[in-house]
Curated annotation (Swiss-Prot):
Role summary: Acyl-CoA ligase; part of the gene cluster that mediates the biosynthesis of azaphilones, a class of fungal metabolites characterized by a highly oxygenated pyrano-quinone bicyclic core and exhibiting a broad range of bioactivities. In the first step, the non-reducing polyketide synthase azaA forms the hexaketide precursor from successive condensations of five malonyl-CoA units, presumably with a simple acetyl-CoA starter unit. The reactive polyketide chain then undergoes a PT-mediated C2-C7 cyclization to afford the aromatic ring and is eventually released as an aldehyde through the R-domain.
Protein name (record): Acyl-CoA ligase azaF
Family of this protein: Belongs to the ATP-dependent AMP-binding enzyme family.
Parts forming coiled coils: none
Keyword entries, A-Z: ATP-binding, Ligase, Nucleotide-binding
GO MF annotations in UniProt: ATP binding; CoA-ligase activity
This protein's record includes keyword Nucleus: no
Ranges where the record places region AMP-binding: 449-525
Pathway linked to the protein: Secondary metabolite biosynthesis
Length: 531
């Protein structure tokens, strides 16, 4: 018998643009998306609907065909989500990339996702253009996403994204058969999965609507909600809520281009924000700022704070809880890209101080397996947690072998996380990760990717990368164990080699250790537990 989430709720089976725009559920002129740094910049439901229809017409005029993948490369902005919806409305597939990526990384992501179009922040075009050209994407299929007067298009020959708005309006791509909502892909976000390089994960209309339904509709709250959106929009931790739930709910949502503690705290206090989602490094930063008199009471309006993407210790959780109002809850959630974000949570107004990540969402199932893959599902039994349910994605795009190893014959996704379910409370607790993924400030770093870069160094014979935990920073960092080709190679040279080729969060901030040999088993697999 599998573990099952309590309760049940009907999940709409339709295309996601109709789900948002077929019917207005609140005042259509009220601002929904607002720029936290300049609240005069805002977008209402009516404006969003018009823009999405214009983008659908413009992208089709530009040659987009059903199933074409469009890469959006930018920091957060109130128009980011509009572009996401416009891409889907045109029949395309949205793909987001980290603004910190190098050309090397962008080249890989564009290639494996089979991107055909690019919309990029002008500040990042120097890295994006070579990557796009390397994947056969011509400049007439690249647009500059300039949203502020201070930004200028740094590269000539590129159209501004608003050129896509000059082709009139077109109805969005509707699904003739509602059941196609369960098979038609709308987003291709990246996950490290359980092993290897970042993998493109395909989300359907149904996956994303299910995520919203199980998180929000199944758990209504007795107060008017306002949100602050500070997590990166390209990331699966933010995408379902930021791009889809926001306009469905109509709750005022204040967008930060990127997380800035002063702006975050000022916005929460000034606009009486009631809900936010964070990751442990953000929690730690807020704690350090709230020790000053200026911000000591800035969080009093918050009623719901959820923390995920990495474990949070109980001491830090208690410290943050003490900054909130007595009726506020600060709880942990658990999920992953492959579960469309959240899989377990503790709904308001229940609190938790035990370190639990919550209970399964309604309609979700879980089982526990041992190291041999045998089902050992039982309360209070530790093993690898596997998930099944409406939010679990179809799989990785164009990677049949990865799908075969990640999903079993019964449709369960092997999370790689070790945990157990408390038999009395039905709360879940995670103990460790089976997978080798390193979590740096909420971002996932695949050791294989960093190892692959280092193996191209002419003076490195062998290498293994592991995560080391920094207790002060409350995050892991990558550390490289290196077998040198010659003894003249120094730590700073190795660090610089990685820094020039990978994003900042993938750098070797955990240091470099030189050793005589990398421990491996008979099949050649690195024995990282010995490092």
């Amino acid at each position: 018998m599998f573990f099952q989430g309590e309760g049940s709720i009907d999940i709409p089976v339709q295309d996601i643009i109709s789900w948002i725009f077929d019917q207005a559920r609140y005042e259509i002129e009220k601002p929904v998306y607002m720029d936290a740094s300049d609240t005069s910049r805002s977008i209402s439901w009516r404006q969003a609907r018009t823009l999405v229809r214009q983008l659908a017409a413009g992208l089709r005029a530009a040659g987009l065909k059903d199933g074409d993948c469009v890469c959006l490369h930018s920091f957060n902005d109130i128009y980011y989500s509009i572009l996401v919806l416009g891409i889907i409305a045109a029949g395309g597939i949205y793909m987001g990339t980290n603004p910190g990526y190098t050309s090397h990384e962008l080249n890989y992501h564009l290639r494996v996702a089979q991107a055909k179009f690019v919309i990029s922040d002008p500040e990042m075009l120097d890295r994006m253009i070579p990557a796009a050209e390397g994947n056969g994407i011509p400049k007439d299929r690249i647009w500059a996403f300039t949203t502020r007067e201070s930004q200028v298009v740094a590269t000539t020959g590129l159209a501004h994204w608003t050129a896509l708005l000059k082709h009139g309006e077109a109805d969005w791509h509707r699904l003739d058969d509602p059941n196609h909502a369960k098979t038609t892909v709308v987003a291709r976000l990246f996950s490290s999965g359980t092993t290897g390089l970042p993998k493109p994960v395909d989300f359907t209309h149904y996956n994303i609507i299910a995520q919203h339904t199980l998180v929000y509709d199944a758990h209504p709250v007795p107060f008017e909600t306002s949100r602050i959106l500070s997590l990166p929009f390209f990331h699966a931790a933010a995408a379902p809520s930021a791009h889809f739930s926001t306009l469905r709910l109509g709750d005022p949502s204040y967008v930060l281009r990127r997380f800035e503690p002063d702006l975050f705290l000022t916005t929460v206090a000034k606009h009486n924000i009631t809900e936010c989602t964070a990751v442990p490094p953000i929690i730690l930063t807020i704690l350090s700022h709230c020790t000053t008199p200026k911000y000591s009471h800035s969080l009093q309006s918050l009623k719901i704070v959820r923390c995920g993407a990495a474990p949070l210790d109980k001491t830090t959780q208690a410290r943050f809880q003490s900054l909130l109002a007595p009726d506020a809850t600060f709880t942990q959630v658990w999920g992953m890209t492959e579960s469309s974000c959240i899989a377990t949570m503790i709904p308001y107004p229940e609190s938790d101080d035990t370190g639990s990540v919550g209970r399964l969402l309604p309609g979700m199932e879980a089982k526990i397996i041992n190291t041999d893959g045998d089902d050992i599902t039982a309360p209070d039994t530790t093993g690898e947690v596997c998930l099944r349910g409406p939010t679990i994605v179809r799989g990785y795009f164009n990677l049949p072998s990865a799908n075969e190893s990640a999903f079993d014959k019964d449709g369960f996704y092997r999370t790689g996380d070790l945990g157990y379910c408390d038999g009395k409370t039905r709360k879940w607790y995670l103990l460790d990760r089976k997978k080798d993924i390193i979590k740096v400030r909420g971002f996932q770093v695949a050791p294989a990717e960093v190892e692959g870069v280092l193996r191209n160094h002419p003076r490195i014979q062998d290498v293994a990368v592991v995560g080391v935990y920094d207790a002060e920073a409350k995050t892991e960092y990558p550390r490289a164990y290196v077998v040198r080709q010659d003894q003249s190679l120094r730590e700073e040279e190795v660090k610089e080699f990685v820094a020039l080729r990978l994003a900042k969060y993938k750098r070797l901030d955990g240091g470099v250790r030189f050793i005589d040999a990398i421990p491996r088993n008979a099949s050649g697999k690195i024995l990282k537990r010995l490092l």
